[in-house]
């Protein structure tokens, strides 16, 4: 079951609420279920012993229509298959379908927000500009999640070929 948040200050609630929810319901703009890590998994990932603590487990995103907010945490590891999956977490049609339930004759605010690696980007507009907002959200999400060339090279160079340690010992 989808969880929608209603209240006077949507942004405050979006920041303070847990990022959970069910699979994409008929109202939700999201097509994938929430994948928030458990508290135990989160602590293990960010412990001092973890080698991956600089790499996030995933990213947070939300769509809001007026005072109704839909949120998701999705796993993302930077791999190409993970990128395609993350980019498909919502589509133009699913956002339009969800928005149509809340948009009436009056102009209301629509917002898309994404947070990845400590950076949050929020796009806002009125219901009359929803199609433009969706286009901008698609480009923004792709840009934020797409690994840079240096990150791609860094992932390759971090993997140590077999025999490297033995070679270092012999050369010293």
From Swiss-Prot:
Superkingdom classification of source: Viruses
BP-aspect Gene Ontology terms: symbiont-mediated suppression of host innate immune response
GO cellular component: virion component
GO MF annotations in UniProt: RNA binding
UniProt-listed InterPro entries: Tombusvirus_p19, VP19_sf
Job of this protein: Viral suppressor of RNA silencing which binds specifically to silencing RNAs (siRNAs). Acts as a molecular caliper to specifically select siRNAs based on the length of the duplex region of the RNA.
Subunit composition and interactions: Homodimer.
Protein name, entry field: RNA silencing suppressor p19
